[in-house]
Protein backbone atom coordinates (compact mmCIF):
# COMPACT_ATOMS: atom_id res chain seq x y z
CA UNK A 1 0.00 0.00 0.00
CA UNK A 2 1.04 3.60 -0.53
CA UNK A 3 -0.40 6.93 0.59
CA UNK A 4 -2.60 7.76 3.54
CA UNK A 5 -6.29 7.25 4.26
CA UNK A 6 -8.70 8.65 3.26
CA UNK A 7 -6.99 10.07 0.16
CA UNK A 8 -4.75 9.78 -1.72
CA UNK A 9 -4.20 6.05 -1.40
CA UNK A 10 -2.92 3.24 -3.61
CA UNK A 11 -4.65 0.10 -2.46
CA UNK A 12 -4.06 -3.59 -3.01
CA UNK A 13 -0.93 -5.66 -3.30
CA UNK A 14 -1.53 -8.57 -5.68
CA UNK A 15 -0.91 -7.77 -9.34
CA UNK A 16 -0.50 -9.87 -12.46
CA UNK A 17 0.55 -8.22 -15.71
CA UNK A 18 2.78 -8.14 -18.77
CA UNK A 19 6.31 -6.75 -18.76
CA UNK A 20 6.42 -3.98 -21.36
CA UNK A 21 10.11 -3.18 -20.96
CA UNK A 22 12.89 -4.84 -19.04
CA UNK A 23 15.46 -7.64 -19.18
CA UNK A 24 15.23 -9.86 -22.25
CA UNK A 25 14.16 -12.89 -20.22
CA UNK A 26 11.17 -10.96 -18.81
CA UNK A 27 10.09 -8.62 -21.60
CA UNK A 28 6.69 -9.67 -22.95
CA UNK A 29 6.24 -12.22 -20.17
CA UNK A 30 3.34 -12.48 -17.75
CA UNK A 31 4.51 -11.96 -14.17
CA UNK A 32 3.22 -11.76 -10.62
CA UNK A 33 4.16 -8.87 -8.34
CA UNK A 34 3.30 -7.63 -4.88
CA UNK A 35 2.43 -4.06 -5.77
CA UNK A 36 -0.48 -1.64 -5.27
CA UNK A 37 -3.09 -1.77 -7.99
CA UNK A 38 -2.51 0.48 -11.01
CA UNK A 39 -2.35 0.10 -14.77
CA UNK A 40 1.41 0.61 -15.15
CA UNK A 41 4.34 0.77 -12.73
CA UNK A 42 8.11 0.41 -12.51
CA UNK A 43 9.66 -2.19 -10.21
CA UNK A 44 13.05 -3.93 -10.00
CA UNK A 45 13.21 -7.14 -12.02
CA UNK A 46 13.87 -8.99 -8.77
CA UNK A 47 10.38 -7.99 -7.58
CA UNK A 48 8.50 -9.98 -10.21
CA UNK A 49 8.06 -13.71 -10.74
CA UNK A 50 7.29 -15.30 -14.10
CA UNK A 51 4.14 -17.38 -14.17
CA UNK A 52 4.33 -21.04 -15.14
CA UNK A 53 3.33 -21.31 -18.80
CA UNK A 54 0.24 -23.35 -17.96
CA UNK A 55 -1.09 -20.97 -15.28
CA UNK A 56 -3.83 -18.54 -16.40
CA UNK A 57 -3.13 -14.96 -15.26
CA UNK A 58 -6.59 -14.75 -13.70
CA UNK A 59 -5.81 -17.61 -11.32
CA UNK A 60 -2.35 -16.28 -10.53
CA UNK A 61 -3.90 -13.44 -8.53
CA UNK A 62 -4.46 -16.05 -5.80
CA UNK A 63 -0.70 -16.48 -5.33
CA UNK A 64 -0.42 -14.44 -2.13
CA UNK A 65 -3.44 -16.23 -0.65
CA UNK A 66 -1.98 -19.59 -1.64
CA UNK A 67 1.29 -18.66 0.08
CA UNK A 68 -0.68 -17.95 3.26
CA UNK A 69 -2.54 -21.25 2.96
CA UNK A 70 0.62 -23.23 2.23
CA UNK A 71 2.41 -21.69 5.21
CA UNK A 72 -0.54 -22.57 7.46
CA UNK A 73 -0.57 -26.16 6.25
CA UNK A 74 3.13 -26.39 7.03
CA UNK A 75 2.41 -25.03 10.52
CA UNK A 76 -0.39 -27.54 11.06
CA UNK A 77 1.43 -30.53 9.55
CA UNK A 78 -1.64 -32.59 8.60
CA UNK A 79 -1.12 -36.24 7.77
CA UNK A 80 -2.79 -39.04 5.81
CA UNK A 81 -6.23 -40.09 7.11
CA UNK A 82 -6.46 -37.10 9.48
CA UNK A 83 -9.85 -35.57 10.20
CA UNK A 84 -9.42 -31.89 9.36
CA UNK A 85 -11.80 -28.94 9.63
CA UNK A 86 -11.31 -25.48 8.20
CA UNK A 87 -13.47 -22.82 9.85
CA UNK A 88 -14.05 -19.88 7.53
CA UNK A 89 -14.60 -20.45 3.82
CA UNK A 90 -13.06 -17.26 2.51
CA UNK A 91 -10.37 -17.40 -0.15
CA UNK A 92 -7.62 -18.43 2.28
CA UNK A 93 -9.76 -20.98 4.11
CA UNK A 94 -10.87 -22.50 0.82
CA UNK A 95 -7.26 -22.79 -0.33
CA UNK A 96 -6.30 -24.53 2.91
CA UNK A 97 -9.17 -26.96 2.32
CA UNK A 98 -7.96 -27.52 -1.24
CA UNK A 99 -4.43 -28.36 -0.06
CA UNK A 100 -5.62 -30.65 2.73
CA UNK A 101 -8.02 -32.36 0.35
CA UNK A 102 -5.05 -33.63 -1.64
CA UNK A 103 -3.69 -35.59 1.35
CA UNK A 104 -4.31 -39.33 1.06
CA UNK A 105 -7.30 -40.49 3.08
CA UNK A 106 -7.85 -37.15 4.83
CA UNK A 107 -11.40 -36.23 5.86
CA UNK A 108 -11.65 -32.52 5.09
CA UNK A 109 -14.60 -30.30 5.98
CA UNK A 110 -15.01 -26.62 5.16
CA UNK A 111 -17.13 -24.88 7.82
CA UNK A 112 -18.93 -21.57 7.24
CA UNK A 113 -22.06 -19.68 8.28
CA UNK A 114 -22.84 -18.97 4.61
CA UNK A 115 -24.60 -21.97 3.02
CA UNK A 116 -23.60 -20.73 -0.44
CA UNK A 117 -20.04 -21.81 0.37
CA UNK A 118 -21.20 -25.42 0.08
CA UNK A 119 -20.91 -25.10 -3.70
CA UNK A 120 -17.29 -23.98 -3.36
CA UNK A 121 -16.56 -26.98 -1.14
CA UNK A 122 -18.21 -29.30 -3.66
CA UNK A 123 -16.04 -27.96 -6.48
CA UNK A 124 -12.94 -28.46 -4.33
CA UNK A 125 -14.01 -32.06 -3.53
CA UNK A 126 -14.23 -31.49 0.23
CA UNK A 127 -17.17 -31.68 2.64
CA UNK A 128 -19.13 -28.69 3.90
CA UNK A 129 -20.85 -28.01 7.23
CA UNK A 130 -22.51 -25.13 9.02
CA UNK A 131 -20.94 -24.30 12.42
CA UNK A 132 -23.63 -26.20 14.34
CA UNK A 133 -22.87 -29.29 12.26
CA UNK A 134 -19.09 -28.95 12.27
CA UNK A 135 -17.25 -32.26 12.65
CA UNK A 136 -16.12 -33.32 16.11
CA UNK A 137 -13.01 -35.14 17.31
CA UNK A 138 -10.81 -33.57 14.63
CA UNK A 139 -7.07 -34.16 14.57
CA UNK A 140 -6.42 -30.67 13.21
CA UNK A 141 -8.51 -27.52 12.77
CA UNK A 142 -7.64 -24.38 10.83
CA UNK A 143 -9.35 -21.17 11.95
CA UNK A 144 -9.66 -18.67 9.11
CA UNK A 145 -12.89 -16.84 9.95
CA UNK A 146 -11.36 -13.87 11.83
CA UNK A 147 -14.21 -14.08 14.35
CA UNK A 148 -14.49 -15.07 18.00
CA UNK A 149 -17.38 -17.41 17.16
CA UNK A 150 -15.24 -19.09 14.52
CA UNK A 151 -12.44 -19.65 17.00
CA UNK A 152 -14.94 -21.13 19.45
CA UNK A 153 -16.20 -23.49 16.74
CA UNK A 154 -12.62 -24.49 15.93
CA UNK A 155 -11.87 -25.37 19.56
CA UNK A 156 -15.14 -27.28 19.89
CA UNK A 157 -14.27 -29.35 16.83
CA UNK A 158 -10.98 -30.56 18.29
CA UNK A 159 -10.41 -34.03 19.58
CA UNK A 160 -8.25 -34.57 22.66
CA UNK A 161 -4.75 -33.10 22.28
CA UNK A 162 -5.61 -31.74 18.83
CA UNK A 163 -4.29 -28.50 17.34
CA UNK A 164 -5.99 -25.33 16.13
CA UNK A 165 -3.94 -23.30 13.65
CA UNK A 166 -5.22 -19.71 13.66
CA UNK A 167 -4.38 -17.84 10.47
CA UNK A 168 -7.02 -15.14 10.82
CA UNK A 169 -6.23 -11.43 10.61
CA UNK A 170 -7.83 -9.56 13.49
CA UNK A 171 -6.09 -6.22 12.95
CA UNK A 172 -6.14 -4.12 16.11
CA UNK A 173 -9.34 -5.73 17.32
CA UNK A 174 -9.62 -7.87 20.43
CA UNK A 175 -11.62 -11.07 20.61
CA UNK A 176 -12.62 -13.40 23.42
CA UNK A 177 -10.94 -16.79 23.41
CA UNK A 178 -12.92 -19.54 25.18
CA UNK A 179 -10.12 -21.12 27.19
CA UNK A 180 -12.43 -22.38 29.91
CA UNK A 181 -14.44 -25.59 29.76
CA UNK A 182 -12.19 -28.47 28.67
CA UNK A 183 -9.49 -26.50 26.85
CA UNK A 184 -6.78 -27.40 29.39
CA UNK A 185 -8.00 -30.83 30.47
CA UNK A 186 -8.13 -31.93 26.82
CA UNK A 187 -4.66 -30.45 26.27
CA UNK A 188 -5.61 -28.56 23.13
CA UNK A 189 -2.98 -26.53 21.27
CA UNK A 190 -3.58 -23.10 19.73
CA UNK A 191 -0.92 -22.18 17.16
CA UNK A 192 -0.59 -18.89 15.31
CA UNK A 193 0.32 -18.84 11.63
CA UNK A 194 1.42 -15.78 9.66
CA UNK A 195 2.79 -15.57 6.15
CA UNK A 196 5.38 -12.90 7.01
CA UNK A 197 7.90 -15.63 7.79
CA UNK A 198 8.34 -19.08 6.30
CA UNK A 199 6.97 -21.73 8.68
CA UNK A 200 9.62 -22.94 11.18
CA UNK A 201 9.52 -26.49 9.79
CA UNK A 202 10.70 -25.20 6.40
CA UNK A 203 12.64 -22.06 7.28
CA UNK A 204 16.16 -23.59 7.29
CA UNK A 205 15.72 -24.71 3.67
CA UNK A 206 13.05 -22.52 2.08
CA UNK A 207 13.33 -18.90 0.99
CA UNK A 208 10.30 -16.71 0.40
CA UNK A 209 10.97 -16.87 -3.33
CA UNK A 210 10.93 -20.65 -3.26
CA UNK A 211 7.66 -20.58 -1.31
CA UNK A 212 6.10 -18.17 -3.82
CA UNK A 213 7.18 -20.38 -6.71
CA UNK A 214 5.59 -23.35 -4.96
CA UNK A 215 2.37 -21.38 -4.42
CA UNK A 216 2.19 -20.52 -8.12
CA UNK A 217 2.71 -24.15 -9.10
CA UNK A 218 -0.06 -25.25 -6.72
CA UNK A 219 -2.49 -22.95 -8.52
CA UNK A 220 -2.33 -25.16 -11.61
CA UNK A 221 -5.59 -26.93 -10.73
CA UNK A 222 -8.57 -25.49 -12.61
CA UNK A 223 -10.90 -26.31 -9.71
CA UNK A 224 -9.57 -23.15 -8.10
CA UNK A 225 -11.41 -21.05 -10.67
CA UNK A 226 -14.40 -21.56 -8.36
CA UNK A 227 -12.86 -18.92 -6.07
CA UNK A 228 -12.60 -16.20 -8.72
CA UNK A 229 -15.34 -13.81 -9.83
CA UNK A 230 -15.42 -12.48 -13.41
CA UNK A 231 -13.29 -9.39 -13.93
CA UNK A 232 -14.64 -5.87 -13.72
CA UNK A 233 -12.86 -2.93 -15.28
CA UNK A 234 -11.22 -0.27 -13.16
CA UNK A 235 -13.48 2.30 -14.81
CA UNK A 236 -16.61 0.41 -13.71
CA UNK A 237 -15.31 -0.25 -10.21
CA UNK A 238 -16.85 2.80 -8.45
CA UNK A 239 -20.32 1.69 -9.52
CA UNK A 240 -19.74 -2.03 -8.92
CA UNK A 241 -17.80 -1.92 -5.66
CA UNK A 242 -20.76 -1.41 -3.27
CA UNK A 243 -22.40 -4.63 -4.50
CA UNK A 244 -19.09 -6.50 -4.51
CA UNK A 245 -18.49 -5.61 -0.86
CA UNK A 246 -21.94 -6.65 0.36
CA UNK A 247 -21.78 -9.57 2.78
CA UNK A 248 -24.27 -11.50 0.64
CA UNK A 249 -22.37 -11.03 -2.62
CA UNK A 250 -20.67 -14.43 -2.20
CA UNK A 251 -17.57 -13.08 -3.96
CA UNK A 252 -14.33 -14.61 -2.70
CA UNK A 253 -11.83 -13.02 -5.09
CA UNK A 254 -12.78 -10.13 -7.35
CA UNK A 255 -10.64 -9.64 -10.42
CA UNK A 256 -10.04 -6.04 -11.50
CA UNK A 257 -8.83 -5.33 -15.03
CA UNK A 258 -6.66 -2.24 -15.50
CA UNK A 259 -5.91 -2.72 -19.21
Residue ranges of each PLM-predicted region?
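Class I SAM-dependent transferase core
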Residues: 48-61
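C-terminal substrate-binding/catalytic core of Rossmann-like NAD(P)-dependent dehydrogenases/reductases
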Residues: 178-228
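C-terminal hydrophobic helical "lid"/dimerization subdomain
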Residues: 206-259
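A structural motif shared across PLP-dependent enzymes of the aminotransferase-like
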Residues: 32-45
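Local beta-strand N-terminus motif with an aromatic residue
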Residues: 81, 137-139, 224
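Mid-domain Rossmann-like dinucleotide-binding core that forms the NAD(H)/NADP(H) cofactor-binding site
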Residues: 59-131
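Glycine-rich cofactor phosphate-binding loops and adjacent beta1-alpha1 units
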Residues: 119, 124-191
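Glycine-rich beta-strand-centered segment in the early N-terminal region that forms part
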Residues: 1-35
Amino acid sequence: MGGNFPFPVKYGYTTVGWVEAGPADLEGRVVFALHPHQNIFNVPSSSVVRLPNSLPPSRAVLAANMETALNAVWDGAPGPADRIAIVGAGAVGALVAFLCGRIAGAEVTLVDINPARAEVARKLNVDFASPERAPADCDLVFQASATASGLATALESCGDEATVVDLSWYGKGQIEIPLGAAFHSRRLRLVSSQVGQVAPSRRPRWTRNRRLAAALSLLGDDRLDALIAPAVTFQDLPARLPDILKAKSNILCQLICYA
